């Protein structure tokens, strides 16, 4: 997804019907705002995050150690229509403190949005991702994400909520609830500052105890201009189960 600053949906969620670890790492730290590449345009977004201070133990046997590990992925997107964007994440990669440089798999994405979301006071969408995972990246070979997008604009302030469900195909009750939230202030048409929160409450059948949940708060600066769009941030863990200090960088550019 380019970085810029209903009934069928419910049926799809039930059909896709799991928990993932609250300590699981991610290649993408981003709140979706329902913006997509224009019709006929290819976009490339580079996602990277580095855990400066985090867990020194793997989330499961054979997994990567989060601390001092770089995770990232190129995201290749194409605007199919004014309401649908297709995406491919390839390759997911890490340079880890315990396994060195590794490839983690790939993801396919289908993003459906309200057209021209950037010009509307209320906007919405939904994103579906399907992942093939290396054994060191996720305990499940196949997983997916269901990400609804809900947002409001109040002048120069945007409020966006992504109530994400992560799915490892182990039953509906084991879907993992991992929402993300963003509030930003648009200083100009090119610059914005934001606070983003990324949470993982655990499986919807029974949330994890508070001390085992992951909650991170990021301070973010966005630049939307030439030659590339940039989003950089620093994140702080709010619970003992969260990585304590994480840096993220997102670079995005239309290719045609």
Language model segments and positions:
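Bacterial N-terminal signal peptides that target proteins for export
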Residues: 1-10
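N-terminal signal peptide c-region/cleavage motif recognized by signal peptidases
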Residues: 19-21
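Transmembrane beta-barrel domains of Gram-negative outer membranes and organellar outer membranes
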Residues: 23-256
């Amino acid at each position: 997804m380019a970085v810029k600053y209903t009934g069928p949906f419910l049926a799809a969620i039930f059909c896709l019907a799991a928990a993932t670890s609250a300590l699981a790492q991610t290649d993408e730290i981003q709140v979706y705002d329902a913006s997509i590449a224009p019709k006929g345009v290819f976009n490339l977004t580079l996602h990277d995050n580095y855990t400066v201070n985090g867990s020194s133990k793997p989330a499961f046997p054979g997994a990567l150690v989060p601390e001092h590990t770089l995770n990232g992925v190129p995201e290749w997107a194409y605007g199919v229509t004014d309401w649908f964007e297709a995406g491919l994440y390839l390759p997911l990669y890490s340079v880890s403190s315990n396994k060195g440089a590794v490839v983690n798999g790939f993801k396919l994405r289908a993003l459906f949005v309200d057209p021209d979301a950037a010009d509307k006071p209320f906007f919405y969408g939904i994103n579906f991702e399907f992942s093939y995972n290396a054994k060191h990246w996720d305990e499940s070979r196949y997983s997916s994400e269901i990400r609804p997008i809900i947002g409001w604009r109040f002048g120069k302030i945007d409020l966006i909520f992504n109530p994400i469900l992560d799915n490892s195909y182990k039953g509906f009750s084991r879907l993992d609830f991992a929402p993300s939230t963003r509030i930003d202030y648009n200083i100009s048409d090119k610059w914005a500052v934001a606070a983003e929160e990324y949470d993982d409450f655990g499986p919807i059948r029974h949330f994890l105890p508070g001390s085992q949940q992951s909650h991170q708060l990021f301070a973010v600066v966005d630049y939307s201009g030439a030659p590339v769009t940039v989003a950089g941030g620093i994140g702080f863990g709010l619970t003992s189960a969260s990585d304590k200090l994480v840096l993220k960088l997102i670079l995005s550019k239309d290719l045609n």
